[in-house]
UniProtKB/Swiss-Prot annotation:
It holds the Pfam family Lactamase_B_2. Zinc phosphodiesterase, which has both exoribonuclease and endoribonuclease activities. GO terms for molecular function: 3'-tRNA processing endoribonuclease activity; exonuclease activity; zinc ion binding. This is Ribonuclease BN. The gene is rbn. HAMAP family: RNase_Z_BN (MF_01818). Zn(2+) 2 binds at D68, H69, D212, H270. Homodimer. Zn(2+) 1 binds at H64, H66, H141, D212.
């Protein structure tokens, strides 16, 4: 999987940072996909600066209905239609997302020429496409807000081809059945169980993308053991009380959660517009003093998961 940050500013855009939007390129050889997490104002313009076509988008996940995470959605939906894109699109989001989209389209005289499904979610598993699942966790924010945990299913271990050949199994279609863990019967009547010739399963990758949040009970479950955790660091340690009063987190809180959850990497985003480049490096240093494996997302930064 590959993360591409389209917007990394909190609340309002700056000269160098747009408001929140994150692309997830699934990069699967047989079931690829492009997912978008949040869609702040100007997201479709940011998308033009990447190699990705809006027609490849098949799912959009909205964390909550504050404008800096949402106001780019109607324009993106309409432009997608005006470009002749007919591929279906599904939007997941909290209660009210359907009314927002339908109202924006209706009062502007707009429509989509592609199938559009809107799913209003609650806490719990919201998607399993056979290769990965997505679970929504409730966060601490003035509006109903969710974080999303994306988990790949474990992949089958490598097939021991040499041992199979030694057992008299010819390479070819039978190998595919054995790779799937099935039992086959050879011409001489012997039964070969594929599970006996498979290495241990390869654990799938896991990713946690937080919406806006202050410290909350669900955060640890959302982030526990993931390879990459994306979390806001809106304000520095000295302004922690202010951040929490508005349903946001400080650098210290983001980094402490990453350490307690045992994540592989913390990526901080959603930084206040009060911080210039020097200030953002200060936020990064504060996080790294607690959790060294921290990176700062800038607009168009790409991370591999």
């Amino acid at each position: 999987m590959e993360l591409i940050f389209l917007g990394t500013s909190a609340g309002v855009p700056t000269r160098t940072r747009n408001v929140t939007a994150i692309l997830l390129n699934l990069q699967h050889p047989t079931q690829s996909g492009l997912w978008l997490f949040d869609c702040g104002e100007g997201t479709q313009h940011q998308l033009l600066h990447t190699a990705f076509n809006p027609g490849k988008l098949d799912k959009i996940f909205i964390s909550h209905l504050h404008g800096d995470h949402l106001f780019g959605l109607p324009g993106l939906l309409c432009s997608r239609s005006m470009s002749g894109i007919i591929q279906p699109l599904t939007i997941y989001g909290p209660q009210g997302i359907r009314e927002f989209v339908e109202t924006a389209l209706r009062i502007s005289g707009s429509w989509t020429d592609y199938p559009l499904e809107i799913v209003e979610i609650g806490a719990g598993e919201i998607l399993d496409d056979g290769l990965r699942k997505v679970t929504a966790y409730p966060l601490e924010h003035p509006l109903e807000c969710y974080g999303y945990r994306i988990e790949e299913h474990d992949k089958p271990g490598a097939l021991n081809a040499q041992a199979l050949k030694a057992a008299g199994v010819p390479p070819g279609p039978l190998f595919q059945e054995l790779k799937a863990g099935k039992t086959i019967t050879l011409e001489d009547g012997r039964q070969i169980n594929g599970a006996d010739y498979l290495a241990a399963p390869v654990p799938g990758k896991a990713l946690a993308i937080f919406g806006d949040t202050g410290p909350c009970d669900a955060a640890l479950d959302l982030a526990k053991g993931v390879d990459v955790m994306v979390h806001e660091a809106t304000l520095d340690i000295t302004m922690e009380a202010k951040a929490n009063s508005r349903g946001h987190s400080s650098t210290r809180q983001a980094a402490t959660l990453a350490r307690e959850a045992g994540v592989g990497m913390l990526i901080i985003t959603h930084v206040s517009s009060r911080y210039d480049d020097k200030g953002c490096q200060h936020l990064l240093r504060e996080c790294r003093s607690i959790f060294p494996a921290t990176e700062l997302a800038n607009d168009f930064t790409v991370f591999n998961v």
